[in-house]
């Protein structure tokens, strides 16, 4: 029997608008309780923190996510690691949060966050967000299958971490 609490890694896609509309007193507390529950079970949570930075500079520790509430909440409230990809970064919290560090240059290919999570047989949690509203896991599958309608595009974004220049993507 597979239960979410048996997971070592959970990749979370979320949309908390409905939860926040129903829980007006302190909606963030519910999210914090959920994340702390998972961490206490030894689960590493990985969350999209996409900034879509295609030009200029991306600061791993400072650039805010444009992918909703959860990543920015985690970056404010938890000790986290964030991947260095300027468009499609991820934050991770928990025992094995370093899984998102030092990823490859491809957002969806070999040595991407998706690739690493796949190798770890991770669980996937769509929280209040239907799969029909999009999911980048599909892009990983497309890239590793070399579909003919996808192509690589490079952007000249400078990546910084802890005030140190890492590279240009």
Where are these regions (language model features)?
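N-terminal and secondary-structure boundary signal
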Residues: 1-169
